[in-house]
């Protein structure tokens, strides 16, 4: 929760990456410079599992990918109402909630289809396919079915209008026991993966070291 040198460098990397948008002058070399300071420190590395970055109880002793996170705790400072944001409105059976979800933002088919077959990030980022009752793994409470050009989430006997369509964000681990929609997941503001991707983009924007850029991206893929 405390900003330090590495969080500051991560912030600079992000600012330099977008410098041309803000000032009209690109700063690709500075992106590489600040990113290299983080990379060469040897402190950070990608988490073994992508989902580790969004767990209810972040284990920072084993997760070296998160450079800076905003801490949240259901008892002292909860990440308020986030559980309600993502699932479709009709799906109030997803957990131990006492009211309905809000049916927040969702992905369109073109974005979902951009994932390559077998890419685990799809299932770890989006609520897709059959979803089961949190206490009964055999009870299907929600199923996403691909009815192009819309991705429709349907449940028998419930409202299946447009407000319930689309794949919802599911990368943050759900606390199925909460009754309020609040959670304790820390918000990972700067991650090592972003630094690798930023350096790769900066190299390509300068027409340099395409092989190095490919290696950086491949670490994440």
Residue ranges of each PLM-predicted region?
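Basic side chains
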Residues: 5, 12-14, 84, 121, ...
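C-terminal substrate/ligand-recognition segments
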Residues: 128-220
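Extended, leucine-rich alpha-helical cores of fungal transcription factors
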Residues: 1-9, 21, 184-192, 196
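Long hydrophobic alpha-helices with heptad-repeat/coiled-coil character
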Residues: 4-18, 206-221
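An aromatic- and glycine-enriched ligand-binding surface/loop that stacks and positions planar moieties
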Residues: 2-153
């Amino acid at each position: 929760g405390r900003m330090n040198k590495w969080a500051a460098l991560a912030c600079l990397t992000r600012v330099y990456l977008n410098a041309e948008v803000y000032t009209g002058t690109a700063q690709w070399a500075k992106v590489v410079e600040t990113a290299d300071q983080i990379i060469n420190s040897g402190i950070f590395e990608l988490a073994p599992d992508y989902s580790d970055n969004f767990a209810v109880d972040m284990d920072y002793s084993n997760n070296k990918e998160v450079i800076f996170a905003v801490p949240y705790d259901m008892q002292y400072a909860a990440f308020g109402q986030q559980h309600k944001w993502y699932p479709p409105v009709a799906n109030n059976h997803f957990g131990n909630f006492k009211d309905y979800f809000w049916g927040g933002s969702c992905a369109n088919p073109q974005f979902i289809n951009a994932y390559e077959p077998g890419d685990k990030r799809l299932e770890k980022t989006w609520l897709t396919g059959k979803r089961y009752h949190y206490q009964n793994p055999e009870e299907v409470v929600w199923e996403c079915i691909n009815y192009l050009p819309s991705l429709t989430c349907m449940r028998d006997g419930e409202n299946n209008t447009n407000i319930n369509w689309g794949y919802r964000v599911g990368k943050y681990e759900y606390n199925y026991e909460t009754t309020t929609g609040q959670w304790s997941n820390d918000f990972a503001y700067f991650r090592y993966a972003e630094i690798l991707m930023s350096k790769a983009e900066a190299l390509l924007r300068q027409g340099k070291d395409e092989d190095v850029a490919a290696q950086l991206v491949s670490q994440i893929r």
